[in-house]
């Protein structure tokens, strides 16, 4: 069997939204890699239809590549992606009427929410969050807590928001003086 790829996503502290796109369009960029994968699958399939060297190593390598890409691509349910984008944006505090506004009209804090939405929608195996509550209101923090608790993914959080950390953790890892201490407890129980 092939080794499992681990996808790690990180919420940067700098803005990556592009001016010119609406909030909804920018958030849909979370799925850009899937469109690229689909294009690559189509390109390989076209190449396979014109090749006649069915027994060659190159042909077999293309078959393996298109199979692996297809398996990855079709494992992701894209049928409801617009609903997922809407639900995530609403959860992070956007109003429906703001979905079609350009991202350039929003402050840095709201653009960070767009980046957080994109990150959550990518559905990575490991989610690294650096101060994710900095630009969120109470309702959005509550939504994010629920999202993380309902997720089956590993989440690594760096935060000064003790209540948030306590509400989402089941395990606390302390890194001190080059050593790692693992506590199977919420943050408040660790203290």
Predicted regions: what they are:
Residues 1-191:
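ABC ATP-binding cassette signature C-motif
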């Amino acid at each position: 069997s092939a080794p499992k790829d681990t996808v790690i996503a990180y919420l940067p502290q700098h803005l990556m939204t592009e001016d010119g796109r609406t909030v909804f369009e920018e958030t849909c960029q979370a799925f850009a890699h899937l469109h690229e994968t689909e294009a690559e699958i189509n390109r390989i399939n076209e190449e396979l239809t014109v090749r006649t060297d069915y027994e060659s190593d190159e042909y077999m390598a293309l078959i393996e590549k298109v199979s692996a890409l297809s398996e990855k691509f079709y494992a992701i349910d894209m049928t409801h992606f617009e609903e997922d984008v809407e639900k995530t944006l609403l959860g992070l505090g956007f109003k429906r009427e703001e979905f079609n506004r350009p991202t350039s009209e929003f402050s840095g804090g709201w653009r960070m929410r767009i980046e957080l939405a994109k990150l959550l929608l990518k559905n990575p195996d490991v989610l690294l969050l650096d101060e994710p509550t900095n630009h969120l209101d109470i309702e959005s923090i509550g939504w994010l807590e629920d999202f993380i608790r309902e997720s089956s993914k590993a989440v690594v959080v760096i935060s000064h928001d003790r209540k948030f950390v306590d509400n989402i953790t089941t395990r606390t890892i302390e890194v001190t003086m080059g050593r790692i201490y693992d506590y199977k407890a919420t943050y408040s129980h660790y203290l």
